[in-house]
Amino acid sequence: MKITQFGTQPYDRESFDRIRDTYGFDICYHRSHLNANNVALAQGSDAVCIFVNDTADAGTIRQLAGMGVKLIALRCAGFNNVDLNAAARYGIPVVRVPAYSPHAVAEHAVALMLALNRKIHRAYWRTRDGNFSLHGLMGFDMYGKTAGIVGTGRIARELIRILKGFGMEVVANDLFPDPQYAAEAGIAYVPLDELYARADIVSLHCPLTDRTRYMIGDAAISRMKPGVILINTGRGQLIHTEALIDGLKEKKIGAAGLDVYEEEAGYFYEDTSDRIMDDDVLARLLSFNNVIVTSHQGFFTREAVDNIARTTMQNIKDFSECRRLENEVRAEPENAVGQL
C-alpha cells in the first residue's frame, strides 16, 4: 500500500521510518502542506497522511478521489481541516489519532499557566542581562484559585487532575455534561457566563465547530474576571485574535498563553526568522510581554510522536485489511464540544 505523507517534519519521518517495515507500507514524504495546488503529489497513492495545517477541502478531496486515493489518515486528533461531507460523497473514509497523549497537551497548558503567572519568561531574559530585580514579577498562588475549563474531553480531564493537585477549584462547561465524572473529579459544570465570571484562569479544550468558532470574542471577554489568564491549546479560531488584543490593551486579560493561532499556517512548524512577518495581527500579539505564543507544540513529546506514528499506521493497516475503522470520523450535524 502506497502512502503520501504531507506536512512532514524530520521527527515525523524518524518516527514513521522506525516502524514502516513492521507494516510493510511504501511511504513518500513531502514537507509541503496538502492543498488543491499540490494534490498531484499524491498521484498513484492509496492513502494520504496529513496533519493540522494541511487542507483537505471539497476541491482537494475531489481531486484525490479522481486519482484513486481511498483513505485520508490524519496524524492528529482534530479534523476541522477536512471536509467530512465531501469525503463521504466521494467514499473516502477519514481516520484520526484521537488520543496520542492527553498528558502532553495538558502538561503544556499547565506550563503556560505557570510561566505567565510567575513571569518566568521575563525573569529568564532579565537575569541573562544581569537584572535580578523582582519588580513586576509578582504572581499569585494557584492554591485556592478557580480554573474554568471549556470542554471536558481527554485532555481537559488530565488537566483538571493536575489543577486539583494544586488545590484549585475547577468549574467546567461542556455541550454534553457528564455528572458522574463531575462527582468523581470534584468539579462543577456551570453555564459559560458563570465560568467566565468566576475563573482566574480560563483554558480552552474544545474542537472547532460552527458553535465554537470565535467563542472568545468581545462579548465573552467582557464577561471575564479582570486580570484573567487565558490559555488556548485547542484550536486557533476558538479565539478572535483582534478581540484578544483589545482585551490585553484594556488590561481585562491579564495574560494569554497560546499554543495555537487562527492564521498559524505558514508560520507554525517553520523557521521564519530570516524574513519580515507580514501578519500584522500576529506581530502585535507577540509584542505583549504578558503573552506567550508557542508553535502548536503541546503534543510534542517523544511518547506522543511515537503514539501518533503507531496509531496512524494501525489505522491504515485496518483499512487495508478491511477491518472495522475504530478511529474513523464522519460528518455530523454538530460535533460535541468535549471531544478533545
Spans of model-derived segments:
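Rossmann-like dinucleotide-binding domain for NAD(H)/NADP(H)
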Residues: G227, G236-L340
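Structural alpha-helical scaffold elements that stabilize or flank donor/cofactor-binding regions
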Residues: A40-L41, E194-L195, A220, R284-L285
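A short helix->loop->beta-strand "cap" motif at the edges of active sites that frequently abuts
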Residues: G66-L71, Y90-I92, M168, P226-V228, ...
